[in-house]
Amino acid sequence: ARSFLHCSRTCRYTARRDCGVCAMSKNIYDVAVIGAGCAGVVAARDLSSAGHKVILLEARDRIGGRTYTGEAFGRQVEFGGAYAHWTQSYIWRELQRYSIGLNPPTEVDKVVWFADGKLHTGTQVEYATLIEPLLTAFFNDARQWFPLPYDISVIDTSDIERQTLRDRLDALNLSTYERDVLDGLLSTLVHSWDEQGIAQLLFWAATYFGNWGAFFEVAGSWPIAGGTQKLVRAIHNDSSAELRLSTPVTNIDDHGEQVVITTQSGEKIMAKKALVALPLNVIADVKITPDVKKPVQDMIDAKHPMQTAKLWVLARGKFEPFVAFAPVEQNPINTVRVEYEHGDDSILVCFISDESTIDTNDIEAVQKALQMFKPDIEVLDVVSHNWTKDPYAQGTWVHYRPGHLTDAAPFMRKPHGNIYFAGGDIATMSMGGIEGAIESGIETAASITHALAQKLAG
């Protein structure tokens, strides 16, 4: 039998029994979706609902990608993802479609923050009085740079795209105390002040009318009732796509008439179109032919810098709920919130700006880090998922390096021949979250459906 590249037209159309490619062509899919995170699952649903034959390939043994609802301390917790909001049109549509609600945020009045070498305590009102002018200064030009967030090309953003988060922080000329207060609040969003671009934070604020308060509420306040997996499973159960778990992909080759996807086991899968819905930091592990455009390849090679961690802690005793902040690089644990009562004990959720600074499985190390905020805390147990060391994530949510928001991501959203890209990491409006993943999956699926219809008509 001849190889695909030399398979003759006659052979293809007469389906010779001894030709492996002809045998595969009988089972050609309309679309192969690679990655069953939120973007891949919703795209597979929409494509199959449009009448296309779809296969959904996932390297893990579960769907959901970087959203992951699991068990800890005898209850359900979110290891990745969690929050949604009624102002997020794409995710709200899905929640309404499947009759899934939101849980109210935990009420917390006590705030603890480490600044200028000291621990400070106050109420939410007192902390807001302190932080509001700092955040206003930090985000003040968000709408100036992104007046129409759905179209970032309307003005030249090259100046702001060159700047890092540290450039913005330095430009504010804050006192040590003020700088630490602002650094601490933003630490949940920061891995490296030097590697992350300021443009994405300003863009996020601009999508919420330049109102940083609205942005923070939407980003991390209202958990999905039943967990993110309830939503992901509801979407998948509404799909007729063929799902294959534990199926990593190594190669995606666009040969013009069809795309050949090679799995780690060596299986060849053929499709008219391929939709790559993988995390940005994983795409470099897949050989894509032909090569993508240079700005896209540069972003793939550079990866995004977010090597953060989310940690769940079981602590002895019930104590007054609090939220705590410490600046990046000044404590291994940077944000803490008392999330639940658990019998006679308490469960805390913690966010770590740099996962390499602490072993999240080391109870003593975690207790020592938490003693910055509560000196008498006794940690009983800890649990987390290391997204940085997860080969199918290699990091948490996306935050672009300087230049990538406007100079690379838009190119990645365009078709690459018969290969398309989707995911929360490259979403047009809400990159970095579930809303962006769903947005990207829906929009890209619609583009593929249109392209297939045009090909059929033409």
Ranges and model annotations:
Residues 151-248, 255-258, 277-279, 287:
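Active-site/ligand-binding neighborhood in enzyme catalytic cores
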Residues 66, 74-105:
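Conserved FAD-binding subdomain of flavin-dependent enzymes
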Residues 2-31, 49:
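Extreme N-terminal leader/targeting segments of oxidoreductases
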Residues 247-358:
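Mid-domain catalytic core of redox enzymes
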Residues 42, 50, 124, 258, ...:
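Conserved flavin/dinucleotide-binding core of flavoenzymes
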Residues 30-56:
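N-terminal Rossmann-like FAD-binding beta1-loop-alpha1 element of flavoenzymes
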Residues 9, 21, 96, 101-197, ...:
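Mobile amphipathic helical/loop "lid" adjacent to a hydrophobic cofactor/ligand pocket
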Residues 48-71:
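Glycine-rich FAD pyrophosphate-binding loop
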